[in-house]
Design a protein with these regions (language model features):
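Ligand-site clamp/hinge motif
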Residues: 135, 228, 256-302, 433-436, ...
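Extracellular/periplasmic solute-recognition and catalytic clefts
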Residues: 158, 177-179, 243-254, 270-330, ...
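N-terminal lobe/hinge region of extracytoplasmic solute-binding protein
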Residues: 46-58, 70-125, 156, 233-237, ...
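Surface-exposed binding/hinge segments that line
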Residues: 169-219
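Alpha-helical secondary-structure segments
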Residues: 71, 147-154, 185-189, 238-239, ...
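Detector for C-terminal structural segments
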Residues: 53, 246, 250, 255-257, ...
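Gly/Pro-rich hinge or "lid" segments in bacterial periplasmic/extracellular proteins
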Residues: 106-108, 204-264, 268, 387-392
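Aromatic- and charge-enriched surface segment that lines or borders ligand/interaction sites
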Residues: 119-164, 181, 187-189, 280, ...
Length: 572
């Protein structure tokens, strides 16, 4: 992953710095990263200027022996090879090697940076008009020239709900128009000056017009260029070219020697899919793979193994369960006291200490530890473990055990539901068992059901008939969270819950227009408190990531903000 990407859904990997645009003044122009804050035009760093900064910060070494294959691993397969349809984190990380966006992000502080298809960009004095100067050497993997017409085509597709992208809502809510000025220049005009405009295009992958323009948008998801069954249709501009996806087994990419940026040292990248966490960790210990994301119980064994390095770092991610608030599906969750009761029934300190072995932070609100709006001391509702309060809240909402069967009921309906979660992780199984037991203690009956990740997505988004689902999620570096909690994000964003609070929407909109960091921070704290009070989702804890990798893998530096596989090389 070359830099961070935008918000993405993560399979449940139980596992700041505010990001602004890196800018330089154009002649007589402002240094400020926020054009609306100064009323003057600004220009970003150039690709070359940013590359020099990156090398100074990260001190990558030159490969002694270029070549070789980096074998990555995961316990779930990717979803698709069509990047505009990708929703979850690992799919995006893999496709990020094949496809490019207009802008990327720095790996040391999360700032937006010119390391993708735009060599640099300018923001006009109106704070709304973004002009991107595209790399003239970029070509599609099939040899076709890349032009601004491809960017316009991709923007048109992303903006159309028929495409089925989870990023449509925020894109069309941010930009009012776009156009190709010429082959090498593209313009985006925001509806108003906003702090978040560049963050919204981190998920705006560019796809080849010549391969997709004759495919109806509604058919993209089932096209051979999305399933990978026709590799000639899986064509990007990135540092690696798609070779093969054997679903449920592996993805193979090969180096793009014609890449316009830093050509990878590696000959190829392979993702291997393992049936479960135990099998994947054993593969790392047996040198069958080069890297794997570890869960807390794996750390002690792997960390002491000669030839393997383990790194730990905080993430922008969190683990949570979400309620389906659509009354046509279920009426159980309409009273927020019921939703609050379920969280009071959980000893999250115990979850962190005994299941995660201390490698997480109990969540207080929705802003993660790495966010500039992280403020655990300012939460308005602190859900400390209190099963008696949980029982009292249920009773206030009319849920009591009237028939003595151990399950509370109301109007003859028991408070019983199905909890969906992703299969494949012993640690997730352990968490689910704890949730079920803790809720049983207050008379609430949860029936867990594990699903493969694509089926989980189907049950919560495409056909949202679920009652509750357990997930992980990763915020983008703006930390403005409307793409999950905004009223207009149901089925065009990540608002699976059908949650809507107009006051919250107004706060998010104000935060987007607020360029002063401290003022924006206060707004985001307000927003976090509203969500934390109303509980459309229950944020359990903020994740840490733990990556284990073989010592022969050089320049591999996973972090909060991603890693750069073009720099990785294998020591022979």
């Amino acid at each position: 992953m070359r830099g961070f990407r935008s918000h993405s859904r993560a399979w449940l990997a139980i596992a700041s710095l505010v990001a602004t645009a890196l800018v330089l003044p154009s002649p007589a122009l402002s240094q400020d990263a926020s054009p609306a804050a100064s009323g003057e035009a600004t220009r970003s760093l150039t690709r070359e200027e940013f590359a020099a900064q990156q090398q100074e910060e990260l001190q990558y070494t030159e490969a002694a022996t270029p070549g070789g294959t980096f074998i990555d691993a995961n316990t779930a397969d990717i979803q698709t090879v069509q990047p505009l349809l990708a929703e979850e984190e690992f799919t995006i990380e893999v496709l990020d090697l094949v496809y490019d966006t207009l802008v990327g992000g720095s790996l040391w502080n999360g700032q937006i940076a010119p390391d993708q298809l735009a060599d640099y960009w300018e923001v006009a004095a109106d704070g709304r008009t973004y002009t991107f100067h595209l790399n003239k050497n970029a070509t599609w993997h099939d040899g076709t020239d890349f032009t601004a017409a491809d960017v316009q085509f991709s923007a048109d597709a992303l903006a159309n709900p028929e495409t089925g992208s989870a990023y449509t809502g925020n894109f069309i809510g941010t930009f009012e128009s776009w156009r190709a000025i010429d082959d090498d220049t593209f313009e985006l005009i925001a509806t108003e000056p906003t702090y978040t405009a560049l963050f919204e295009i981190l998920s705006f992958y560019i796809v080849p017009k010549h391969l997709w323009e004759n495919v109806p948008l509604a058919e993209w998801r089932n096209d051979p260029g999305a399933s990978g069954t026709d590799p000639s249709r899986v064509v990007g501009t990135g540092p690696f070219k798609f070779q093969e996806w054997i679903q449920g087994d592996s993805v193979t990419l090969v180096r793009n020697d014609a890449y316009y940026g830093k050509v990878p040292y590696l000959d190829s990248y392979v993702l291997r899919v393992w049936p479960d966490q135990t099998a994947m960790v054993n593969a790392l210990l047996n040198d069958e793979i080069d890297a794997a994301e570890l869960e807390a119980p794996d750390i002690a064994a792997v960390e002491g193994t000669p030839g393997i390095t383990v790194v730990h770092y905080p993430t922008r991610g969190f683990s949570y369960y979400e309620f389906n608030l659509d009354p046509e599906v279920t009426t159980k969750w309409q009273d927020q006291r019921v939703r609050q009761a379920l969280l009071y029934a959980l000893d999250r300190e115990s979850i962190v200490d005994n299941i995660l072995l201390g490698y997480a932070e109990v969540a207080q609100g929705t802003q993660p530890v790495v966010s500039y709006a992280y403020a655990p001391d300012q939460v308005t509702t602190n859900y400390t473990y209190d099963p008696e309060k949980a029982t009292a809240l249920l009773a206030e909402a009319g849920w009591t055990d009237t028939d003595g069967d151990g399950v509370v009921d109301k109007d003859g309906e028991p408070l019983a539901f199905e909890l969906l979660y992703q299969t494949g992780s012993p640690l997730t199984d352990q968490l689910v068992a704890y949730l079920q037991d803790a809720w049983s203690g207050i008379g609430v009956a949860a029936t867990p059901r594990s699903l493969e990740f694509p089926a989980l997505i189907e049950a919560t988004t495409t056909n949202p008939t679920f009652e509750m689902a357990l997930y992980g999620f990763s915020w983008n570096a703006s930390f403005i969270q409307d793409f999950m909690f905004g009223c207009d994000q149901y089925q065009v964003g990540f608002n699976d819950m059908k949650y809507c609070n107009e006051e919250l929407d107004a706060i998010y909109n104000q935060a987007k227009r607020t360029f002063d960091e401290e003022a924006r921070r206060e707004l985001l704290i307000q927003a976090s408190n509203i969500v934390n009070d109303e509980q459309p989702v229950a944020v359990l804890y903020f994740n840490q990531d733990h990556d284990g990798f073989r010592d022969v893998v050089q320049n591999y530096r996973p972090s909060t903000w991603g890693e750069d596989l073009t720099q990785v090389w294998i020591q022979q």
